[in-house]
Every structure is written in C-alpha cells, then in structure tokens.
C-alpha cells in the first residue's frame, strides 16, 4: 500500500521508498534543463567563434550540470510548497523518495562542480557567469522573490534567459549585443508563458501561498500584461534580423511566429469569464513553448546552413 507517496508494509509499518536513478534525474528538472541546454547551445553555435566539437560538448555539459544543480536546489528549498500543489506533489522530495538533506548535498555538488569544470576546461568568464546564474535563480528568485511578489517571474526570469549568453561566453570569452538580444527574447517571453500557465492552475499556486499575478491582481490585469509582454517579445525576436546578425529566413519566420504569439495573447485578452479563459490560456501556454523553440531552432538552422553549406 501507499499513502501520500510513502510505502506501507503488510503490518502497516511506514517505510521510505528507495530512490532510483530516475528520481535523481527528476530532481534535476529535466524539462527545464532541456530548454537551458538548447538555448545555451544556440548561443554557443551562433557566436562569431567556431568552436571545436569536443570543446562545445564540454561547455554544454557544464551548463547542463549547472542547470540541473540549480533545479535540484530549487526543489530542495521549495519542498514545503511542492507538497501543497497537485502539480508538484509527486516530485522526489515531497513524495518521500529523496530526503531534503540528500537533495541539498547532491545539488550543491553538481552546482559547484559545474562552475569549477567550466572554469578549468572552458574559461573563467563563462564559469563566473554560470555561477551568477545559479545564484540568481536560487537566492534572488527562489528564496527572495517567489514568495513575496507577483513580479517574481518577471525579475527572476532573468535566470532562465542567461543560458544563451553563457553559451556565447563559453565560445568567445565575452558577451555582445547579439547575445544580449537572445537573452532579451527569453526574458520578455517568460512572463506571458508562465502567467498563461497560472491562469489555468491558479488554485495550485493559491494553495501554496505563492503570489502569482492572477491571484494577486486578478485575471484581467494578468491578461493585459500577457498581451503587452507578447508584443514586446515579438518585437525583440526580430532584433537579430534588424541588427544584421540573422538572415532573411529568420527575419520572416520570427515576424510570422511573433504575429501568431500576439494573436494567441489577444484571443486570451478578449475572454471575459474564467471558463472562457482556461482553454485559451492552455493554448497560449503550449504555443509559447513552441514559439520559443521555433525561434531559437530557426536561428540555429539558418546559421548552420549559411556558414557550413552555402559558404
């Protein structure tokens, strides 16, 4: 038998489930980490420096380890509120599969190791950038902002937007306007992405006492801000083409995709009741995932075609 993720023997004695490799992988937030790895890879590849494949692999591996360590640290700190939310109750710590102590040790080792290896094997500028990103995500966002302000995801979203700049820094040892534009796309995309999620899962956040925008300012204010941020995101996404860094394929694609993103946000803005809002919010949320992946994917593909096939 099982009760709330705990296992019972035949005589009803409570025992802790044994953690598996998959539980420790889940602790790394693999879905979030996959986005971190992908955007970092794009930043590394589209930089002006052509890196050796092995060098690039090591750099991305270090970023992945750091992203996973940060995700695990986040789960360690938020174990109390994860236990209150249906969406997160089955995570390794609240389900009792991994203790908070083990999670802290595991995540700390990964975080420190990623920065050390990045510095020794790649360069110390990108290593310090990675360390700052981990610090920002855990201390600024997770510990400080998330539980006190509905603007948590706006400011804290910077942590999720840094990876392409870290990838760029790994290749070049510096940052530039072009890498900052990649950061800006993700930074502006984050609020409409997460707030559309909150519009159809607000009860979860409310139960955990997290002040997300729909619960604090209401659905109408949230929809207004989603539309504004979607427009800003669409404009920022055209930036690499305007500056001349990206080509016409990216320029046309980012314009079309940006228009679609704004259209979904506009449809959401037009809804009045909660029942009308939920299905459109879900569509907006899932399209936002596709949108970001497509923007970075097209940028990467166009760059590879131009530099390694046409040239």
UniProtKB/Swiss-Prot annotation:
The EC number(s) this enzyme carries: 2.5.1.141
PROSITE patterns for the chain: UBIA
Signal peptide annotation: none
UniProt record similarity statement: Belongs to the UbiA prenyltransferase family. Protoheme IX farnesyltransferase subfamily.
GO biological process terms, semicolon-separated: heme O biosynthetic process
MF-aspect GO terms: protoheme IX farnesyltransferase activity
EC category: transferase
The protein's name in its UniProt record: Protoheme IX farnesyltransferase
Database matches in CDD domains: PT_UbiA_Cox10
Keyword Cell membrane in record: yes
Pathway stated in the Swiss-Prot or TrEMBL entry: Porphyrin-containing compound metabolism; heme O biosynthesis; heme O from protoheme: step 1/1
GO CC entries: plasma membrane
């Amino acid at each position: 038998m099982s009760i709330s993720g705990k296992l019972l023997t035949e005589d009803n004695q409570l025992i802790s489930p044994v953690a598996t490799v998959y539980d420790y992988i889940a602790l790394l937030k693999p879905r979030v980490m996959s986005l971190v790895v992908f955007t970092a890879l794009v930043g590394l590849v589209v930089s002006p420096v052509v890196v050796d494949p092995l060098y690039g692999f090591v750099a991305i591996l270090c970023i992945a380890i750091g992203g996973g360590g940060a995700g695990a640290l986040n789960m360690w700190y938020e174990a109390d509120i994860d236990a209150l939310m249906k969406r997160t109750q089955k995570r390794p710590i609240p389900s009792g599969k991994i203790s908070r102590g083990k999670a802290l040790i595991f995540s700390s080792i990964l975080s420190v190791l990623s920065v050390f290896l990045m510095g020794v094997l790649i360069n110390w500028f990108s290593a310090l950038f990675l360390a700052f990103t981990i610090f920002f995500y855990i201390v600024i966002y997770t510990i400080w902002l998330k539980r006190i302000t509905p603007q948590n995801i706006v400011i804290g979203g910077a942590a999720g937007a840094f990876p392409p700049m870290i990838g760029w820094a790994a290749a070049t040892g510096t940052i530039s306007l072009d890498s900052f534009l990649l950061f800006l796309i993700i930074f502006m995309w984050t609020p409409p992405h997460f707030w559309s999620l909150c519009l159809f899962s607000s009860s979860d956040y409310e139960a955990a006492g997290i002040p997300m925008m729909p619960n604090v300012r209401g659905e109408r204010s949230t929809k207004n801000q989603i539309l504004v941020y979607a427009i800003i995101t669409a404009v920022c996404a055209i930036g690499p083409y305007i500056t001349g860094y990206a080509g016409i394929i990216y320029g046309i694609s980012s314009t079309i995709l940006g228009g679609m993103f704004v259209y979904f946000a506009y449809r959401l803005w037009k809804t009045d009741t909660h029942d009308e809002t939920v299905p459109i919010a879900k569509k907006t949320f899932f399209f936002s995932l596709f949108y970001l992946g497509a923007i970075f994917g097209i940028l990467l593909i166009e760059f590879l075609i131009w530099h390694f096939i046409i040239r």
